[in-house]
Amino acid sequence: MAREGFTLECTSCKMQNYISKKNKKLHPEKVKLSKYCSKCSKHSVHKERK
């Protein structure tokens, strides 16, 4: 199956906050999103992590 699950990790505190899925064939690059981190209590960049 092409769709793969991954977690999003906060770049500030390294906490894994979100779980998501993507199609690896259509989007092979790593995901970077601005999301809210409950540990930092602010919006920060979250990067894809296996």
UniProtKB/Swiss-Prot annotation:
InterPro entries assigned: Ribosomal_bL33, Ribosomal_bL33_sf, Ribosomal_zn-bd
Keyword Ribonucleoprotein: yes
Gene Ontology MF annotations: structural constituent of ribosome
SUPFAM superfamilies on file: Zn-binding ribosomal proteins
GO biological process, one term: translation
Annotated keywords: Ribonucleoprotein, Ribosomal protein
GO cellular component, one term: cytoplasm
Family: Belongs to the bacterial ribosomal protein bL33 family.
Protein name: Large ribosomal subunit protein bL33
